[in-house]
Amino acid sequence: ILANVLNGISYASILFLIASGLSLVFGVMGILNLAHGALYMAGAFIGLTAAGYWGNFLMGVVVAVISLGVIGLVLDRLFLSRLYKQFNEQALLTLGLVYICANVVMWIWGPWSRIGKSPAILTDSVTIGDFNFSVYRFAIIAIGLVIFGGLWWLQDKTKIGARIRAGMDNKEMTTGLGVNYGMISTAIFILGAIMGGLAGFLGAPIIG
């Protein structure tokens, strides 16, 4: 039972990274981003390619984060920032982006799935009772907890978080008080894209 619980928590940590990025974008910007799963996929392939090229897992993380940040910036500035509260247009655009991203990934990396390798320092297992549990899965759980704490601190304990909450309640009034909510929204979309891509790369050794 303990093995199933720990495995479930490690999977839940990956799902948390995906879902938190999606909910941030929808909650703060009101953007229904159906392409969030495509960002997850892009982060996985970009990170795996970088990690394989440099032979370093950390480089995969860095490249995936930077790449998804740039992709998020481009998507927000060129498309999504113009579609505030236009839910039908958002759905059509982001659904189209899913197909575009899927075809670009297939064109570059082919139709075959890939399994990521965990970093050498985290390849060992810990014996718990009668079973061995991967150190990498423990690391994923820890990363999920750290990000959860970081998001809570950002939202509830900082001035930026207060502005985010105010904008979620009333964007027009917040903007009227002199808050550059457009910049905050762009930063949130970039953060959401990064979290989706990071989940893809970190989850590759577990999910594939």
Which sequence ranges carry the predicted segments?
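Alpha-helical transmembrane segments within multi-pass membrane transporters and channels
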Residues: G55-V98, V104
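Helix-loop-helix "hairpin" substructures at the membrane interface of multi-pass membrane proteins
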Residues: N132-G208
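Membrane-water interface at transmembrane helix exits
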Residues: S23-F26, A51, L75-D76, L80, ...
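Membrane-interfacial amphipathic/re-entrant helices at transmembrane-helix boundaries
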Residues: I1-L17, I46, F57-G60, Q86-A91, ...
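Alpha-helical transmembrane segments in multi-pass membrane proteins
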Residues: L15-A19, L39, G43, G47, ...
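Extracellular/periplasmic helix-loop junction at the C-terminal end of a transmembrane helix
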Residues: Y99-G129
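Single transmembrane alpha-helix segments in multi-pass membrane proteins
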Residues: L2-T49, L78-E89
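Short loop-to-helix capping motifs
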Residues: N33, N56, D169-K171
